[in-house]
């Protein structure tokens, strides 16, 4: 996943909102859960379910000599969504670039699978349709393939055994039953500034929210929200780094409401550039995908890049060139290849970038090695429509974006996406497709569980609030475990990132840039927005480089 939850992260509530090659089912049907509940390796009567553990993304550290040299403006290391989008943006003005990927497929954590009438995601599941995200889709020829969720579809949080709707607009605040009246009053007074003053040091998400909005908002909304976005621990996540826009409201306006009014005033007084008329106009707060899943975006960019995208190219070393720029050595299917480039963008995970950069800057490598990526499992299962509890049905159907589960509510699953309700053509008629996330910073023990154990946990959890207790066992569509899933923006994250960049500068690594979800943010939309930002940095450098 590049976030997201959950990242780049895959998440059902956010509106900001490391994978192995695809492995498909060997037969044209899915296996009932009852057939695998006591098995570690799944193979019953010829049926085989698609269950896999994502392999670590590794880059060889040994230097390799030889191979022809080629002069390039930029080499982008890593063909996840960040690297691909940087290349897409830059290629208009700097077509003399290359994107290299150690694995045999592009797209990073985006993993869309289609089989037997089901279409599901095993990494990020959707994106916020922001203008940068929509611009990228339109520029890649995907405007007609965009699909948007119903903005009126409810979102739920599990609390005291019931799935309770989250308010989607201000008029809902007085009536929703997720919080008590005292809790609502505490949040309201805190939002206008009647709360303890900031402590003068960087706060965790939990500290910031409890101080500004009270314990109920934290426990019943923000804690599960953090699980959905980061699969993280809000007592350790940095408010400034993880939710910077909200943090800035208090910083600039003295309170959350004060900052909101100030931001509105500044926007109204600032001339606004005309919106690109090519872009669709999403209604309300919704999320988006594509007709054939998120995979369509990296596939479209890959097709546009053509021979500029190199797969199964394993970076062995980077050295500074005497004539300026950098010398890169790769192990490729064709043998050892050497490249000469004026600039490099590292969009691989921070722990991979750390290993590659260590010969160039020990301090930068040490800083990048500090970021933590907890494991997350994506368990996709399907039930017949009649398995859904009657109270969860609207007009005979399950409707909504999905549900999140606070850690205090006695379930292990982080949350569930209603995949077949969110977007069209995700499951056959009469079937409900559910994408469930499990693991995260508070539950790394999932790495010791088998796929059947993960499915058993998810099925048991769902029968507590969504599925009828005596419903038939689910069919298992896919199980994917990401050992290092989502970078955690912990307290000190921004300082650590600044330390890495400063060390690179101190070591004279001009023209070497960092990108990816640990830099931009974990949501898919933030990766795309971050790609525009990094592309602007690189093109600015190349413009200056041309005059040296």
Curated annotation (Swiss-Prot):
Enzyme Commission code(s) on record: 1.3.3.4
Compositionally biased tracts (Basic and acidic residues): 265-279
Disulfide partners: none
Reaction(s) this enzyme catalyzes, per UniProt: protoporphyrinogen IX + 3 O2 = protoporphyrin IX + 3 H2O2
Enzyme class label: oxidoreductase
InterPro entries from the UniProt entry: Amino_oxidase (IPR002937), FAD/NAD-bd_sf (IPR036188), Protoporphyrinogen_oxidase (IPR004572), Zeta_carotene_desat/Oxidored (IPR050464)
Quaternary data: Homodimer.
Subcellular location per the Swiss-Prot or TrEMBL entry: Plastid, Chloroplast
Transit peptide: 1-50
Gene source species: Nicotiana tabacum (Common tobacco)
Gene3D superfamilies reported for this sequence: FAD/NAD(P)-binding domain, protoporphyrinogen ix oxidase, domain 3, Protoporphyrinogen oxidase, mitochondrial, domain 2
Primary localization: plastid
PANTHER family assigned to the protein according to its UniProt record, in alphabetical order: PROTOPORPHYRINOGEN OXIDASE
Family per record: Belongs to the protoporphyrinogen/coproporphyrinogen oxidase family. Protoporphyrinogen oxidase subfamily.
Identification of the protein by name: Protoporphyrinogen oxidase, chloroplastic
Record's note on what induces expression: Oscillating expression during diurnal growth. Maximal expression in the dark period.
A molecular function (GO) term: oxygen-dependent protoporphyrinogen oxidase activity
GO annotation, cellular component aspect: chloroplast
Cofactor note (record): Binds 1 FAD per subunit.
Cofactor: FAD
Region described as Disordered: 265-287
GO BP of this protein: chlorophyll biosynthetic process; protoporphyrinogen IX biosynthetic process
Keyword Chloroplast: yes
Physiological role: Catalyzes the 6-electron oxidation of protoporphyrinogen-IX to form protoporphyrin-IX.
Residues binding FAD, per UniProt: 78-83, 101-102, 123-126, 522-524
Known pathway: Porphyrin-containing compound metabolism; protoporphyrin-IX biosynthesis; protoporphyrin-IX from protoporphyrinogen-IX: step 1/1; Porphyrin-containing compound metabolism; chlorophyll biosynthesis
